[in-house]
Amino acid sequence: MTVDELWQARAAAWELAALSLRYPGSELAEAAAGGEWDEAAGEILAALGLPAEVPAAAGDPAGPPAARAADTAGPAGADALLRALRPEATRLFVGAPEPACSPYEGVWAAEADGVQPLLFVNPRSMEVERFMRSCGLGRPEGTNEPLDHVATECELLERLALRAAGAPASEGAPDGAGLPGGSPAAAYGRFLSGHAQAWMPAFAERLAAEARHPFYRAAAAYLEALLAD
């Protein structure tokens, strides 16, 4: 594998992680129901040399693979899976009154420091926002989602990996020398070690423990394996 191919594999890895940890949509449900998610996760981890046991994303994890595929394949299976994933994602990541597994780095940092977490205005969230803006990634217009959401952090790593593989900068993003550390690879390494690896392993562990649907146990195992790269 060439250096560019390695970065392309990393970009694909974080793209799948971001898709998996956003609020579920039809793209995710179709991929998980049809088996494409399982195939992609296995191929990506193998390409990166990260052996891991990732459970099946859909169906009865104890049942035979053929039966799981038959139960979930096709539009009806994807629709049923989406109806199951959305309330589970809400319970896990939004909660009432508290999420079972907060998806925000700032909340995890505050918890580690023993202080009350505040979205947006806590020091870690503000640090993440500054880093992302320095890479050309800001909050989408008309939204108020904090940028330290796990899926957004995965998206940043995907973008930096693509830049390291030779992709051009998106509109409004600095050139390579203008990124933190002076290059896409350096910015990727800084964010991975300084942010993602600082809190996502604990997030993945709690997600695996709290998840009631097989998909989120699979997503947790995949993320945990990816963080070892």
Predicted regions and their residues:
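Surface/interface-facing alpha-helical segments and adjacent flexible terminal/loop regions used
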Residues: 1-229
